[in-house]
């Protein structure tokens, strides 16, 4: 009698059998089974276990792991799953890996470190675990094959430069709890077509979406008070812009070169309006009452008219290269006419030639040489 291990084909328990017999009765479930089948089942299962152990050992050799942090990946596989003991992907762990196409992160991974996947130009897909809490700065910058990203539900911020220059990124889905989108977060994502900024976002950093050339619509939520410098600059397809009542300031070049913008409605309560330089699609622009400062509108080559409230006393920028801008409604225009070159060179020059007041076009009193309309003294 030669006793060997087998697995009962009925209950799955491991039992010892006589390999010379044709049949055996399981001592656990009292069910008879064919001996050769039970022996083969045992061999197959343990062969598979051995193969998996071998694969894990081989796979593990590609990883450098310290205290649960995946410090470095040294392999060249196209698909990688994080080992079970990993709770953080360390800084630079996969940086500039050009063979990696797919990454699977298990539920214990809570943090992806800075620069972790930067320059992984072949990376097409990454599945984030639901419990992921943070993706640090520059983590996926330059992942030019990445097309779709779904941010997991517990993340509260998008760090600086996280997805910058992901030139083939088409869509990004944010969870509602996101409160901050960092500087340069999606800068240079020239194929990004759709974004829906969550209602709890209060900060959109500078250059956050600059160079997103296919982005057509943006709605800024109520909690955002400042649109930072160049946040949406060079979004050349942007044609629909919704600005909330919570906005107090539009920063320098915030919408620079958004050439598809035709109409922009600035809500009341905005104190400073800047950022529309090079918006060649604008024909008319109204600055709301209460605004105290406006900035640079130069290179708005098709702008024909602008309305500015009396609360604005001076302008810090200019309207150079606005050749069509002749219709200006502003009570303080007289003191600032030089900032409107087209207006100054045509309207003011013609008034001088006609002997009229350069400020309002009125006639002068004969003796005092003061304007009968605005009271300004003739100074030319």
Name each model-derived stretch:
Residues 5, 23, 354, 368:
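Residues immediately within or flanking Cys/His clusters that coordinate Zn2+
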Residues 8-11, 26-29, 357-360, 371-374:
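Short cysteine-rich clusters marking metal-coordination/redox-active sites
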Residues 16, 34, 363-366, 379:
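Short functional micro-motifs and their immediate structural scaffolds
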Residues 22, 38-58, 341-347:
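Short, intrinsically disordered terminal segments enriched in charged and Pro/Gly residues
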Residues 30-40, 375-380:
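Short Cys/His-rich micro-motifs in 6-15 aa windows
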Residues 57-66, 74-88, 98-111, 121-134, ...:
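Structural signature of tandem-repeat unit edges
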Residues 91-93, 113-116, 136-139, 159-162, ...:
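Consensus positions within tandem repeat domains that build extended binding/scaffold surfaces
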């Amino acid at each position: 009698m030669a006793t060997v291990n087998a697995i009962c084909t009925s209950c799955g328990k491991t039992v010892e059998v006589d390999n010379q017999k044709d049949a055996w009765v399981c001592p656990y479930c009292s069910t008879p089974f064919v001996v050769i089948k039970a022996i083969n089942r045992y061999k197959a299962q343990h062969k598979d276990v051995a193969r998996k152990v071998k694969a894990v050992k081989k796979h593990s050799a590609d990883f450098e792991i310290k205290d649960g942090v995946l410090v470095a990946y040294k392999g060249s596989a196209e698909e990688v799953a994080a080992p079970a003991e990993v709770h953080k992907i360390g800084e630079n762990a996969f940086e500039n890996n050009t063979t990696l196409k797919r990454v699977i992160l298990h539920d214990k991974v809570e943090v992806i470190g800075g620069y972790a996947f930067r320059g992984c130009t072949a990376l097409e897909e990454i599945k984030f675990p639901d419990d992921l809490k943070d993706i640090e700065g520059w983590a996926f910058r330059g992942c030019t094959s990445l097309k779709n990203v779904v941010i997991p539900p517990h993340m509260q911020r998008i760090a600086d430069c996280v997805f910058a220059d992901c030139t083939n990124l088409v869509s990004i889905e944010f969870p509602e709890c996101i409160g901050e989108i960092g500087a340069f977060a999606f800068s240079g994502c020239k194929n990004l077509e759709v974004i829906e900024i969550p209602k709890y976002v209060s900060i959109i950093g500078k250059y956050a979406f600059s160079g997103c050339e296919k982005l057509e619509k943006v709605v800024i939520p109520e909690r955002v008070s400042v649109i930072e410098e160049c946040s949406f600059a060079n979004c050349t397809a942007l044609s629909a812009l919704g600005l909330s009542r919570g906005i107090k300031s539009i920063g320098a070049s915030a919408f620079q070169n958004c050439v598809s913008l035709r109409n922009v409605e600035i809500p009341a309560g905005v104190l400073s309006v800047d950022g529309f330089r090079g918006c060649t699609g604008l024909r008319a622009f109204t600055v709301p009452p209460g605004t105290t400062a406006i900035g640079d509108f130069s290179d708005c080559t098709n702008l024909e008219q602008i309305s500015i409230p009396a609360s604005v006393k001076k302008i810090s920028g200019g309207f150079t290269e606005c050749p069509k801008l002749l219709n200006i409604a502003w009570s303080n225009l007289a003191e600032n006419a030089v900032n409107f070159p087209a207006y100054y060179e045509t309207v003011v020059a013609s008034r001088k030639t006609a002997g009229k007041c350069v400020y309002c076009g009125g006639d002068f009193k004969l003796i005092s040489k003061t304007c009968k309309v605005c009271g300004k003294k003739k100074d030319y």
